[in-house]
Structure formats: C-alpha cells, structure tokens
Amino acid sequence: MVGYDPKADDRDISNVEVAVAGSVSGLVTRVLISPLDVIKIRFQLQIERLSRSDPNAKYHGILQAGRQILQEEGPTAFWKGHIPAQLLSIGYGAVQFLSFEALTELVHRASVRDARDFSVHFLCGGLSACVATLAVHPVDVLRTRFAAQGEPRVYKTLRDAVVTMYRTEGPLVFYKGLNPTLIAIFPYAGFQFSIYSSLKRAYEWALPAEGKKNGNFKNLLCGSGAGVISKTLTYPLDLFKKRLQVGGFEQARASFGQVRSYKGLLDCAGQVLREEGAQGCFKGLSPSLLKAALSTGLVFFWYELFCNFFHHMRKADS
C-alpha cells in the first residue's frame, strides 16, 4: 500500500529504501514513455490547430507526428533531453514518495483522521509533489528545452544548455513556469494518490477473491486509471506550463510554426483561449492520456514492487 497504514505489516522499510524504490520506479518508467512525452510536448507548443485541415500545422496526430519526427530527426529524437529527464524522474520519484510516506505518517500520529482517507491522500500527495517539484524544476526546464528544439540543435549537451541559458537569460530561467507548475501539480498529484488508493479499495471490494491475488496487475490497472482521471482534470495547466517554459526560446521554435511570447500564467491562458479556443487548452491530450496511463500505472507498479521486495528481504534476514 502506498502511504502510511498502521494495520499493514509490509511497510517496515527504511527511508533510504523508500527513496530507492521511488527513484527506480521513475527511472524505468521514463525510459519507456519518453517517445510519448516528446510528442506530447511538440503538440502542446504548436500554435496551429492539430488538424489535417490546417495546412500550416506541422503535427496533427500521434502516428503522423511520430513518423515525421522519425523522418526528420531520426529515432534518437524520441529520447531528446533524456539525461535531464532521467535526472528529473530519479530525483522527483525519490523526494515525492519519501515526502508522501512521511506526511501520511505525520497525519496519522498528529490527528484522529485515518491516514488512508481520500482527503488525506489528496492533501499529502499534492504537498509531496510540490516539494519534489521545487527540488527538480530546473531539470524540468532543461528537459522541455531539449524536447522542444528541432534541427539544427541549439543545445548540443546538457552542460552547453545550462551555460547558454544562464548566460543569455539569467538564473531565473531555470524556474520559468514554476507558478503554473505548482498550481497544476498539487491537484494532479493529489488526485493521483487519492484516486489510486480509492480504485484499489474498489477493486478489492468488487473482486474480493482477486483482490488478494494478482497484486501487481491490480497496482498497474489502478495506477493507470488514476493517471488518466488526474491528467484530464488538470491538463490545461500543464499546457500553460510548457508554453511558459519555452519563453525566450522562440528562435529555435520557428521551424515548427508560429511562436508566441507570454508575460505570465494569466496572459498565457488568455492568449491561448483567444487565438486557439477552448480546444487549444487540450492540445496534446491524446498522447498525454496515453502517457499518463502508462507512466502512473508503471510508477505505482514499480514502487510497490520494490517496496515489497525490500520488505521480503528484511523478513528473510530476520
């Protein structure tokens, strides 16, 4: 079970083991879903409609975008920014799960509320994600820049990107899009954790015999469902965040179509609604939902798997 549960006997693991489980779950998942992430970011940053009817649109569908990126930039393009993305996943996973476990235990010890309640998991999930975001946001900006650039590349290496961005845009460039990120990540992660635990309980109630078995499949299925629901509810804020993160990067974006500059979150939201309509707030939703289903399902699957592995190792040693 993710989160503190006083009745569970399978969470007698150390903070280091929790951090390792969170890190590895993020690392493995990132390798698998990186191509979808690149396509999603390209969709989010495209001003033109994602439609065949718009002659100026570079991308209009997942398969078409995948083929075009492959033809123009080669297979490695699907792992553009993979090093910063992996640093992001490893650091974020460790901090988020460690914070979540600590916060749910704190709630249990400091109040009479059940640490497994939907509201407790929502609040602790949101707060743990905010802590993790503050820790790794500069890496997220780097990942977005790498995934957004076409050919020829503006940044050749991670070091080149850090030096160039710092020199041309100042230190605050590494926290571009932080406000919408925090605003978006709190409800997104809150829903992820709370819906995941709720779906697991619903699964065990609906299939009591199966609920005790096939734990790995249950974790994967419930994690995927939680990812899809959470992403749908909070998607527009994720799009605004991506648009803000590539501010000052307009020249490298010119080959992809129109570019825009935004003064902040409200200005970004206003421009998107005026120029692209309400549907503009959901550009890239399809690959995002597919990515959310895979990534959230896999993250919870791997996290629970590694936690159980550490638990059984301790049990065998005792």
UniProtKB/Swiss-Prot annotation:
Q: Which domain of life is it from?
A: Eukaryota
- Name the chemical reaction catalysed here: thiamine phosphate(out) + thiamine diphosphate(in) = thiamine phosphate(in) + thiamine diphosphate(out)
- Membrane topology per record: Multi-pass membrane protein
What protein does this entry describe?
Mitochondrial thiamine pyrophosphate carrier
- GO biological process assignments: thiamine diphosphate biosynthetic process; thiamine pyrophosphate transmembrane transport
The encoding gene is: SLC25A19
Q: Which residues carry this modification: Phosphoserine?
A: S51
- What is the residue range of the motif Substrate recognition? 241-246
Q: Does the keyword Transport apply?
A: yes
Q: What organism is this sequence from? A: Bos taurus (Bovine)
InterPro entries per the record?
Mit_carrier, Mitochondrial_sb/sol_carrier, Mt_carrier_dom_sf
GO cellular component terms? Answer: mitochondrial inner membrane; mitochondrion
